[in-house]
Amino acid sequence: KEPFMVINADDYYGKEAFQKLYHYMTTQMDASKPVFDICMAGFILSNTLSENGGVTRGICEVDSQNHLQRVIETYDIQKRDGMISARNEEKQKITLQPDQHVSMNMWGLPPQFLDVLESGFVEFLDNLDEKDAEKKEYLLPKIIDKLLAEKRTEVTLLETPDKWFGVTYKEDKPLVVEAIRGLIETGVY
């Protein structure tokens, strides 16, 4: 069993994010620690927004050593009138800073973490209510946030300046196609 990376299939994360996670996983990740040794790409919020509507991001709180303290799922994040506004889990309107770190679901995980995912997924399915089952998600940031609260993991945030892009809205597609074309033309991708 080897460390593994989890990403969203419909996102472009950038080259540096992959390099940083790979380097951490192959040179620093320590499976002998008494807690799960996890790493994640910490994107800059302003580099992860859609021009076509609100997005959901995990807002990251970190300590002075860039160890993740909490991931707070935040919804309907949009730039309006030069400000970035969003809704928290209680549906209250909040203002965010453009340079805040966010999770884009790019995680480096030790092999034994699969056991946590499996047992948690069984519990998630057992507790699903049929009336809203189609809208419920088994969110990795919430799982990791729970482990952080229980002091069962240490997560190192690896900051990346890469610009994320993905198709959150159908109107995003032409922008993504053009961005990927540009990456191909310049030899990045």
Language-model-detected regions and their locations in the chain:
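Conserved alpha/beta core of the MobA/IspD/sugar-nucleotide pyrophosphorylase nucleotidyltransferase superfamily
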Residues: 62-64, 71-74, 78-189
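Short aromatic/hydrophobic "clamp" motif used to bind/position activated sugar donors
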Residues: 4-6
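Glycine-rich phosphate-binding loop signature in dinucleotide/nucleotide-binding domains
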Residues: 1-2, 32
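Conserved core of the sugar-phosphate nucleotidyltransferase
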Residues: 14-107
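The conserved acidic donor/metal-binding loop of glycosyltransferases
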Residues: 9-12
